[in-house]
């Protein structure tokens, strides 16, 4: 008998809550002018829409984008999914905004830890 293993959900996602409808995840509206890929750390803008975490003053990381990439144009929103609570992630496999400092990445991980999204070492 041949068994074919499917693609893992994500290289950055070590564990999440089990159950119907994936309770760790939330559907989100992706803000305009975004390019989100699997494993991108996101925040929510003033309208509650997901955007790449940029580490600006008072910005709080709200989750990690999961699934197929979503690119939105100027003035156009999209649909996506984020891991928003209770999960274990491999920090070195997460995607941050290009040029984001290590200190701001650490701050984002601290925000995620408050949501019970914690880091583990890669195998």
PLM-predicted stretches and their roles:
Residues 1-123:
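Surface-exposed, low-hydrophobicity beta-strand/loop segments enriched in small/polar/acidic residues
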């Amino acid at each position: 008998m041949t068994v074919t293993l499917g693609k893992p959900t994500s290289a950055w996602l070590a564990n999440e809550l089990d159950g119907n409808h994936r309770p760790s995840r939330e559907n989100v509206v992706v803000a305009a002018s975004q390019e989100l890929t699997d494993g991108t750390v996101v925040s929510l803008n003033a309208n509650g829409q997901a955007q790449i975490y940029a580490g600006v003053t008072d910005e709080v990381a709200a989750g990690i984008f999961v699934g197929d990439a979503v690119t939105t144009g100027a003035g156009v929103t999209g649909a996506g999914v984020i891991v928003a609570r209770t999960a274990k992630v491999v920090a070195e496999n997460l995607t941050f905004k290009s040029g984001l400092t290590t200190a701001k990445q650490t701050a984002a991980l601290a925000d995620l830890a408050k949501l019970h999204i914690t880091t583990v070492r890669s195998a």
